[in-house]
């Protein structure tokens, strides 16, 4: 009964969904540099993965995985622009301990390698 009452409330005004999504965004912001999974994020909200994925996508417009990758790559781009940290160190700092995986993910998002992106965007 409690879950169905909550579901009715969500359909009426969305405030419970907003709460869960804000909790998830806060968790991502605080933990993106760690090896976190969508299960970890959904568990931090007290939800199962499939329900969490649906409300997150309905609210944000993309899957939790897409959002996490985008968030990490935005942070990586900031670090590439303003620091002289190595590509490996930046990958590590944004949750990619494997430099090859980081470089591939970065290139998927930006269409260019982290090294080339840095060369084109570095603040001197």
Question: Which sequence ranges carry the predicted segments?
Answer:
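Alpha-helix N-cap/loop-to-helix boundary motif
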Residues: 13-16, 33, 37
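Generic C-terminal helix-cap and adjacent flexible tail
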Residues: 119-124
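Hydrophobic recognition helices of helix-based DNA-binding modules
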Residues: 1-5, 28, 56, 80
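Sigma70-family region 2
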Residues: 4-9, 33, 57-58
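Basic/polar phosphate-binding segments, predominantly the helix-turn-helix DNA-binding elements
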Residues: 27-29, 35-71, 85, 91-116
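Pre-recognition alpha-helix immediately N-terminal to the DNA-recognition helix
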Residues: 19-27, 68, 74-78
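An amphipathic alpha-helical interaction segment
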Residues: 1-12, 16, 20-23, 47, ...
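Hydrophobic/aromatic residues within well-ordered alpha-helical segments
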Residues: 1, 72-75, 83
């Amino acid at each position: 009964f409690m879950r169905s009452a909550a579901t009715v409330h969500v359909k009426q005004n969305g405030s419970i969904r907003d709460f869960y999504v804000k909790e998830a965004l806060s968790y991502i912001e605080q933990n993106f540099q760690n090896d976190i999974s969508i299960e970890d994020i959904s568990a931090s909200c007290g939800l199962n993965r499939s329900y969490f994925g649906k409300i997150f996508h309905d609210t944000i417009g993309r899957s939790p995985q897409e959002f996490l990758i985008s968030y990490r790559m935005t942070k990586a781009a900031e670090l590439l622009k303003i620091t002289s940290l190595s590509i490996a160190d930046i990958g590590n700092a944004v949750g990619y301990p494997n430099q090859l995986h980081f470089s591939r993910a970065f290139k998927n998002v930006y269409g260019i390698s982290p090294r080339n992106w840095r060369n084109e965007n570095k603040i001197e």
